[in-house]
Regions:
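Acidic, metal/ion-coordinating pockets
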Residues: 1-128
């Protein structure tokens, strides 16, 4: 099993003893921004999706123990139009916006935890 060094040791999944080894053989943990860029590129350019929505569970802001977060994801990717995040259990009263690699404002939203809040977001499509 390979692990990206950006993941802190406490965040690296320990599967030994939880899952039979044959069931996780070959599992590779990769850098989220790279994977997000690759998948978003396929969705936008190959599959011709109008909107790419990222559902993440990496937390929304960086801290010294965990540089991998939604802000980092947005600022290091192309082709993602909206990010709905989780993990930090944050509730945003207003949508936050961060610029992606193309300088486009990307909305980021989190709706707390335990299903207490249900969020909505209206997207407007403009024909190009």
């Amino acid at each position: 099993m390979r692990l990206d060094s950006r993941f802190p040791i406490w965040q690296r999944p320990r599967l030994e003893g939880l899952v039979q080894e044959k069931n996780y053989e070959g599992v590779v943990y990769t850098e989220p921004n790279e994977v997000a860029n690759n998948v978003a590129d396929i969705l936008k350019n190959k599959e011709k999706c109008d909107v790419v929505i990222c559902l993440s569970h990496i937390g929304w802001e960086p801290d010294p123990k965990n540089p991998v977060c939604d802000i980092d994801l947005i600022t290091h990717t192309h082709n993602i139009d909206v990010v709905f995040g989780g993990h930090s259990h944050s509730f945003f009263e207003k949508t936050l916006y961060y610029k992606n690699l193309d300088g486009k404002d990307i909305p980021l939203q989190q709706m707390g935890k335990n299903g207490i809040f249900v969020g909505t977001m209206d997207l407007k499509f403009v024909k190009e």
